[in-house]
């Protein structure tokens, strides 16, 4: 079977806390291990020829976690971006952040904006990092923009352009790890015709081999988009 490479893959990186708990480690240790896995999957995506990759890093609901864990997660993100940005540039990755920014530390927002600006010329991979992102919040913010327009102007295409992920095509494949079978308020508008793949593997144990399993499963599917296909 030949492998069909999707143009856009989105991933819900779930299971960091459970991975740490199984090993008697603090939850943040799972997140640090998960960041290492994310880095490897990003590199593998480039090798495979995937053009767009969206990673769910922090949701609007994650603010409900203990304050110490939230602070540690944002410190992990800041440290990762600061230490890895040059590697991202060297790999030719354009980085974009989707989600709200009004609740994030101003220094981190400044770093995010700097990376977006410095990487905008790269085209090997479009990497979307969802930070303080929620699908309902995304749609609500788009509606607030749309109400300023004439009703006749608003089309499905125009509304899509008001969403956070407007610079990337809708995902072809969504992967969620750790066995949960739900999309958890992620890219609600954009996942209309996305193929869903659920892996039992906890994110810190997710490997290139596991990623290939998802792509092999995707390659066997017939995407109809509402049409009737010949069997």
Curated annotation (Swiss-Prot):
Question: What exactly does this protein do?
Answer: Catalyzes the condensation of isopentenyl diphosphate (IPP) with allylic pyrophosphates generating different type of terpenoids.
Known SUPFAM superfamilies for this protein? Undecaprenyl diphosphate synthase (SSF64005)
Any matching Pfam family: Prenyltransf
Whom does it interact with, and what assembly results? Answer: Homodimer.
Q: What is its EC number?
A: 2.5.1.-
What note does UniProt attach to the cofactor annotation?
Answer: Binds 2 magnesium ions per subunit.
Q: Which organism is it from?
A: Aquifex pyrophilus
Q: Which InterPro entries match?
A: UPP_synth-like, UPP_synth-like_CS, UPP_synth-like_sf
**What Gene3D superfamilies does the database record attribute to this sequence?**
Decaprenyl diphosphate synthase-like
Active-site feature positions: 14, 62
Q: Does the keyword Metal-binding apply?
A: yes
For this UniProt record, the keywords arranged alphabetically read as follows: Magnesium, Metal-binding, Transferase
Q: Which PANTHER family match?
A: DEHYDRODOLICHYL DIPHOSPHATE SYNTHASE 2, DEHYDRODOLICHYL DIPHOSPHATE SYNTHASE FAMILY MEMBER
Q: Which HAMAP family match?
A: ISPT (MF_01139)
Positions annotated to bind Mg(2+): 14, 195
Cofactor dependency: Mg(2+)
Q: Which family does it belong to?
A: Belongs to the UPP synthase family.
Entry-linked CDD domains? Cis_IPPS (cd00475)
The protein, known as: Isoprenyl transferase
Residue ranges that the Swiss-Prot or TrEMBL entry lists as coiled coil: none
Class of the enzyme per the UniProt entry, highest EC level: transferase
The residues the record assigns to binding substrate are 15-19, 27, 31, 59-61, 63, 65, 176, 182-184
Q: Name a biological process GO annotation.
A: polyprenol biosynthetic process
GO terms for molecular function, please?
Answer: ditrans,polycis-polyprenyl diphosphate synthase [(2E,6E)-farnesyl diphosphate specific] activity; magnesium ion binding
């Amino acid at each position: 079977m030949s492998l069909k490479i999707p143009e856009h893959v989105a991933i819900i990186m779930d299971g960091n806390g459970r991975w740490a708990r199984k090993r008697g480690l603090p939850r943040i240790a799972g997140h640090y291990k998960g960041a290492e896995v994310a880095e490897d999957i990003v590199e593998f995506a480039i090798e495979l020829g995937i053009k767009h990759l969206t990673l769910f890093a922090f949701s609007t609901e994650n603010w409900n976690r203990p304050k110490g864990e939230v602070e540690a997660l944002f410190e992990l993100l800041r440290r990762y971006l600061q230490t890895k940005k040059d590697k991202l540039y060297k790999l030719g990755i354009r980085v974009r952040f989707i989600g709200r920014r009004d609740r994030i530390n101003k220094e981190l927002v400044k770093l995010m904006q700097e990376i977006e600006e410095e990487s905008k010329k790269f085209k090997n991979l479009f990497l979307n990092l969802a930070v303080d992102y929620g699908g309902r919040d995304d749609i609500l913010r788009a509606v607030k923009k749309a109400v300023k327009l004439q009703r006749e102007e608003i089309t499905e295409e125009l509304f899509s352009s008001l969403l956070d992920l407007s610079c990337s095509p809708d995902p072809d494949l969504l992967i969620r790890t750790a066995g949960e079978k739900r999309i958890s308020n992620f890219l609600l508008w954009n996942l209309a015709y996305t193929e869903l793949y659920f892996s039992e593997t906890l994110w810190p144990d997710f490997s290139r081999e596991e990623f290939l399993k998802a792509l092999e499963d995707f390659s066997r599917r017939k995407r109809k988009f509402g049409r009737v296909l010949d069997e």
